């Protein structure tokens, strides 16, 4: 190994609707906690996804990872599942999981991690709005 660690980023966008709701709670408690995000008719976001992959540069290719391969992986595992979908109704991943930005980021991480070579480290940054975003995993 050449010990030249580097990080590459791939940015993608997808649009999805969702509703934040805990079925164990009363309607009043859901509204108090989730506010407008608890709208029974759902609401949507134009998500910005940044996938960060780190590792060592391959001395044969000069790449960390071929970005076309990473792009195809994101399309297959994330965009095809979630783009222009109602996350609560149209996806298996959120049938029983509240589709908060935090949970969406963890699900995306798990989907990509399962298909990404173990030699790479992975981090997901998901923007729900221009000012609100989450990152997973995080260091303690």
Annotated model-derived regions:
Residues 1-140:
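Charge-rich, low-complexity N-terminal segments
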């Amino acid at each position: 190994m050449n010990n030249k660690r580097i990080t590459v980023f791939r940015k993608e966008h997808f649009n999805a609707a969702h509703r934040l709701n805990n079925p164990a709670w009363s309607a009043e408690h859901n509204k108090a906690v989730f506010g407008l995000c608890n709208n029974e008719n759902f609401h949507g976001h134009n998500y910005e996804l940044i996938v960060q992959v780190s590792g060592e540069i391959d001395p044969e290719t000069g790449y960390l990872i071929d970005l076309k391969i990473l792009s195809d992986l994101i399309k297959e595992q994330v965009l095809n599942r979630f783009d222009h979908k109602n996350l609560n109704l149209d996806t298996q991943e959120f049938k029983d999981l509240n589709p908060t930005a935090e949970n969406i980021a963890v699900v995306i991480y798990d989907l990509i991690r399962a298909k990404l070579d173990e030699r790479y480290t992975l981090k997901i940054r998901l923007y729900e709005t221009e000012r609100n975003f989450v990152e997973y995993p995080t260091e303690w």
